[in-house]
Amino acid sequence: MRVALGIEYDGSKYFGWQRQVEVDSVQAQLERALSKVANEPISVHCAGRTDTGVHATGQVVHFDTDAIRKESAWTLGVNVSLPDDIAVRWAKVVDEDFHARFSATARRYRYMIYNYQLRPGILRSGVSHYRTHLDENKMHEAAQHFVGEHDFTSFRALHCQSKSPNRNVHEVNVTRQGMYICVDIKANAFLHHMVRNIVGSLIEIGLGHQSHEWIPELLALKDRSKAAPTAKPNGLYMVDVTYPEHFQLPKLALGPLFMLD
């Protein structure tokens, strides 16, 4: 039997999604809890691996098991065995041809900026704090240059292992709600650090250090060293994964929960 799960987590205390030998990860905690409920070793596959300190409200995973359980066992039962900063949001038995990564047609991320001169007292691990005023309208205008299929070499990590730097960005929106700025980006897939590198350059534009024409210049240069530094991880959320309709996976509010959809 193959089961898909929707997962949310606060990545602050974890060394990313992927299971590692000597440090704690979201995957390791989830597999431990699932194995306890299934009474057999469980290995999960995710839609996209998140880095150290990055969060998710819409991560999707799947696993195979011989255990026969009610769907509530994979939600309520697993949540009992998970730490408070990881939770299963939904569970669904799926066909054998479903794959959390390879069946996905798009991923969506939101990067949350707290734009105020004084630091936040709450949500400090869930937002990135920038004291100097950012012009979200200029950031949004510049972000439209990313839409479409491009070579994102200037916006990938130097150690990115993806064979191709090409990605198709479906949409990017930069909006403000009071002191919060949200960079909302959807694409077929993302390169390592791609979202945070994009945000880093948009921040330079929001500060007035660069114009919106800088973005197409960076895309053409195909040189990571020419773009801005990588934005901090704590403002980044994986909020949604798109799959073909026939899988009929549950659709919940994207989050983060303090954002209005």
Swiss-Prot record:
GO molecular function, one term: RNA binding
Keywords: Isomerase, tRNA processing
UniProt: substrate binding residues: 109
Chain's gene name: truA
Enzymatic reactions: uridine(38/39/40) in tRNA = pseudouridine(38/39/40) in tRNA
EC identifiers of the protein: 5.4.99.12
Role noted for this protein: Formation of pseudouridine at positions 38, 39 and 40 in the anticodon stem and loop of transfer RNAs.
Any one Pfam family match given in the protein's UniProt record, by short name: PseudoU_synth_1
Active-site feature positions: 51
Keyword tRNA processing carried by entry: yes
The keyword Isomerase appears for this protein: yes
Protein name from the UniProt record: tRNA pseudouridine synthase A
Group of enzyme by EC: isomerase
Subunit relationships: Homodimer.
An individual GO BP term: tRNA pseudouridine synthesis
The organism's place on the tree of life at top rank: Bacteria
Family to which this protein belongs: Belongs to the tRNA pseudouridine synthase TruA family.
InterPro entries per UniProt: PsdUridine_synth_cat_dom_sf (IPR020103), PsdUridine_synth_TruA (IPR001406), PsdUridine_synth_TruA_a/b_dom (IPR020097), PsdUridine_synth_TruA_C (IPR020095), TruA/RsuA/RluB/E/F_N (IPR020094)
